[in-house]
């Protein structure tokens, strides 16, 4: 057949390194780093990068893109004859870099908008600044992972499973069935596109249904809301009922307990005073509903405190792993140098260490020299030094942790919080604790977050390459290409979404970015309602002591219920499908999971497109394309003889039924 039999991933051989045989033997030379592989990888990086930004701002979470990209690549590259498994691997490698960089960007850089009024963070929320920080962080994550590859991927093969990387290799090796798998993903994309187009663009039915009690009710200002979106159903199906239930329980506490309680105890005049003290204008307050006023004045900070404490708990829990990772990985540099001369095989060629060092120094120089980034000369020099120190620390940690627990469980938020706390304390100790240095501290946190996120993805991709017989240096250059290409669209997506709908609004609450801003402001300005933040921290600690995941619960406590309830519903749909199918655990390659992945991709990409429609002016600038399209739907809804909320539930229930139908199918892959 021309290739070696792949080693088993399920059992641990006595000497995994010696017995490992990649799918493509090292002595074989097959097409790998080709133009079509780079082109498709870049395209997927752009698409999944934009999709990830949308989802991260909306729900504070992301979905791994490597397996969906591998599935789609296998199908699309079949258009070209003689497409190889190594070309498909390059496609998913480049594409996954876009998704991981987008996650790091969306979790941190929008925090520029939420810093103290005197910090001037908005001035650095520009396309050029976003693109620069994203590119520096993403490339740094790739570079710092290079000297660790031999230690973590090769020497610890059989010890560090790298679950997503191994699963992706299995997908590539099972490429004969790629057409069926890709059809399921494309089907989900098509269904979500049509649904979202009719729903969000043409407004043929409401985007959300809600119930709010009156201020005079027994339970005043209680609110239940459900956003009728395909992407949230897909996310919920992927996460499952347990995580979805934990998330919605946080929203239940906020909107059905805390806000009604505050409504009974806090007078309207006091709420007004507190909002004005937080910097809200009277005009903005007048435009808020009563529930929104209580959320902006109080529960938003309770949620931020909960997320902060949850991140700290996650960091403390992983501290033994972090210490062990550092101890076991610090020898990787010398190990890679010692083995470099003997590495003659194609499958052992890494990017030269000299290039890594030169690249890291060059990135630090870019940070210190560019005027588009925050801080004076001293601030930028400190930013460059702290970026290198914290960057190498948490790239090392992230690269090892994802090998043990997978990228989905990587405590990126905790690492970023630790970076922000350390950076802010360094600045304060040097007398640079004013508001003007908040954007500088946040920039360090953003770069480290992006680097750690991309290092985790890089590790999984290199594990996939190790199993299928890829050339590491080609993957590493592919990752750099994926980072650079995706940064162009990531910045545009953030700009469009903020300009069209407003980041920080109910539509895009950006919970992770709000958390990062809270940490920076808390250390450097002390101008925060600490009482409510500490209440949230105490609640998260209580939830953890009850044996529940504090981060999922805390994110739910911060998010609007309109975001968490549909995720829970999606999880319930998976539970129903599992019961119907008679299988407890569903494979990532099952019809239901692949269809749900398509729903997420189709829904989020169409959501990004709506922001573009919003930016296209019509009627001489008095209107826009999205408003005109939604006007057609409003005219249609006015003719309907039934309640509009009931009408909106009909297509949503049909979509839910379709998800169950796809989920109950037996896995044929």
Model-derived segments and spans:
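Alpha-helical multipass membrane-protein architecture
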Residues: 1-669
């Amino acid at each position: 057949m021309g290739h070696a039999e792949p080693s088993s991933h399920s059992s641990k051989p006595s000497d995994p390194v010696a017995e490992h045989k990649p799918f493509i033997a090292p002595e074989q030379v097959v097409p790998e780093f080709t133009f079509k592989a780079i082109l498709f990888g870049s395209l997927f990086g752009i698409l999944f990068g934009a999709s990830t930004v949308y989802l991260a701002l909306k729900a504070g979470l992301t979905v791994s893109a490597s397996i969906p990209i591998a599935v789609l690549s296998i199908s699309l590259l079949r258009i070209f004859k003689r497409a190889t498994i190594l070309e498909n691997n390059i496609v998913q490698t480049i594409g996954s870099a876009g998704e991981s960089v987008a996650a790091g960007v969306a979790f941190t850089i929008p925090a520029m908008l939420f810093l103290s009024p005197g910090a001037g963070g908005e001035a650095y929320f520009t396309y050029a600044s976003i693109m620069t920080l994203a590119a520096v962080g993403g490339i740094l994550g790739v570079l710092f992972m290079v000297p660790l590859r031999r230690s973590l991927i090769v020497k610890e093969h059989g010890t560090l499973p790298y679950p997503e990387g191994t699963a992706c290799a299995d997908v590539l090796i099972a490429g004969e069935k790629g057409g069926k798998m890709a059809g399921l993903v494309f089907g989900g994309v098509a269904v979500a596109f049509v649904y979202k187009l009719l729903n969000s663009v043409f407004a043929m039915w409401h985007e959300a249904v809600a119930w709010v009690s009156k201020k005079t009710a027994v339970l005043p200002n209680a609110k239940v809301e459900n956003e009728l979106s395909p992407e949230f159903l897909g996310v919920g199906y992927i996460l499952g009922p347990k995580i979805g239930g934990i998330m919605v329980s946080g929203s239940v506490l906020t909107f059905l307990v805390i806000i009604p309680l505050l409504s009974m105890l806090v007078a309207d005049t006091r709420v007004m005073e507190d909002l004005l003290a937080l910097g809200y204008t009277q005009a903005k307050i007048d435009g808020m509903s009563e529930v929104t006023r209580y959320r902006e004045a109080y529960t938003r900070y309770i949620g931020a405190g909960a997320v902060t404490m949850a991140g700290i708990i996650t960091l403390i829990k992983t501290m033994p792993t972090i210490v062990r990772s550092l101890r076991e990985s610090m020898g990787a540099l010398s190990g890679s140098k010692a083995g470099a001369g003997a590495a003659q095989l194609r499958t052992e060629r890494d990017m030269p260490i000299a290039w890594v060092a030169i690249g890291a120094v060059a990135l630090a120089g870019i940070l210190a020299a560019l005027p588009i980034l925050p801080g004076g000369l001293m601030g930028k020099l400190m930013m460059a030094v702290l970026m290198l120190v914290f960057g190498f620390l948490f790239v090392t940690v992230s690269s090892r942790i994802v090998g043990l627990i997978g990228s989905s469980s990587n405590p990126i938020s905790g690492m970023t919080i630790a970076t922000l706390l350390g950076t802010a304390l360094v600045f304060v100790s040097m007398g640079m604790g004013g508001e003007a240095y908040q954007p500088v501290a946040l920039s360090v946190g953003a770069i480290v977050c992006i680097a750690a996120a991309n290092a985790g993805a890089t590790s999984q991709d290199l594990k996939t390459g190790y199993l299928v017989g890829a050339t590491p240096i080609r993957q590493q250059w592919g990752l750099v290409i994926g980072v650079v290409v995706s940064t162009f669209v990531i910045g545009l997506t953030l700009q469009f979404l903020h300009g069209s709908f407003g980041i920080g609004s109910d539509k895009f609450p950006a919970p992770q970015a709000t958390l990062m801003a809270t940490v920076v402001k808390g250390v450097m300005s002390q101008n925060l309602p600490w009482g409510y933040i500490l209440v949230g921290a105490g609640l998260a600690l209580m939830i953890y002591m009850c044996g529940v995941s504090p981060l999922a619960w805390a994110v739910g406590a911060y998010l609007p219920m309109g975001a968490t309830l549909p995720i829970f519903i999606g999880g319930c749909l998976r539970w129903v499908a599992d019961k119907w199918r008679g299988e407890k655990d569903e494979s990532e390659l099952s019809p239901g999971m692949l269809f749900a992945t398509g729903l997420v991709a189709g829904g989020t990409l169409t959501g990004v497109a709506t922001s573009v429609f919003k930016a296209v002016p019509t009627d001489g600038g008095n209107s826009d394309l999205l408003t005109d399209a939604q006007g057609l739907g409003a005219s249609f809804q006015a003719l309907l003889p039934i309640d509009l909320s009931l009408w909106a539930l009909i297509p949503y229930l049909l979509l839910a039924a379709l998800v169950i139908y796809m989920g109950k199918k037996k896995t044929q892959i």
